Amino acid sequence: MSKNNYIIRLERKEEQREVENLVRESFWNVYRPGCFEHFVLNQLRNDDAFVPELNFVLELDGKIIGQVMFMRAVIKADSGRDIDIMTFGPIGILPEFKRQGYGKILLDYALEKAKALGCGAVCMEGNIDFYGKCGFTYAKDYNIRYHGLPDGEDSSFFLCRELIPHYLDGVTGEYKTPDGYMVSENDVEEFDKLFPPKEKLKLPGQIF
């Protein structure tokens, strides 16, 4: 896809470290001092659930400024069935290009490609204020619970979007984040040594 001066395409192997650094810049000191997301991306590329056909970068004037990647996941239905879905993330935009609409452009494109691959629904953790603009709503509206979250606890972070209409009709069940997203702090620290030094700061609004 190309329009005006940007293009969305698949990530190339030789760009992986550059894209990891992009993710590091995008998430640094946002949710916690430092970040984990660049290491998560590094690990997920080798995960069995990784979807290489949905591993996109957004290039502006020849410079990579954004990325998104997808993973296969399941909803464990109360009926005993596994409902095949996908999740995505990290999705990152370089700080100097945030709040200019590029994240939405990238995600909208990727979701259309996921639908073309036969993905019926996507679940993820995120902010409804942003992801609502991309068609997501609260997963509880689809009767999907978040694994390990007690009844009555705030689940407003847990979002879902059907890509195929009625795909989740009649489904009640539970979603668990794919295991590949779980990384250790020690492993992150070692991986981070491969990148230029950055100061970790405790800032207002961080959640970890």
Give residue ranges: language-model regions.
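Conserved N-terminal entry element of GNAT/NAT acetyltransferase domains
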Residues: 1-14, 21
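Cell-envelope/extracellular anchoring and linker segments
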Residues: 151-153, 157, 162, 197, ...
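Conserved active-site alpha-helix within GNAT-family acetyltransferase domains
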Residues: 116-119, 126-153
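A short, well-structured alpha-helix characteristic of acyl/acetyltransferase catalytic modules
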Residues: 13-26, 170-204
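Conserved acetyl-CoA pyrophosphate-binding loop and the N-cap/start of the following alpha-helix
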Residues: 97-109, 119
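Internal, conserved structured core segments that host functional sites
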Residues: 54, 58, 89-92, 119, ...
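Conserved acetyl-CoA binding element of GNAT-fold acetyltransferases
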Residues: 80-95
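Active-site rim helix/loop that mediates acceptor-substrate recognition in acyltransferases
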Residues: 20, 27-74
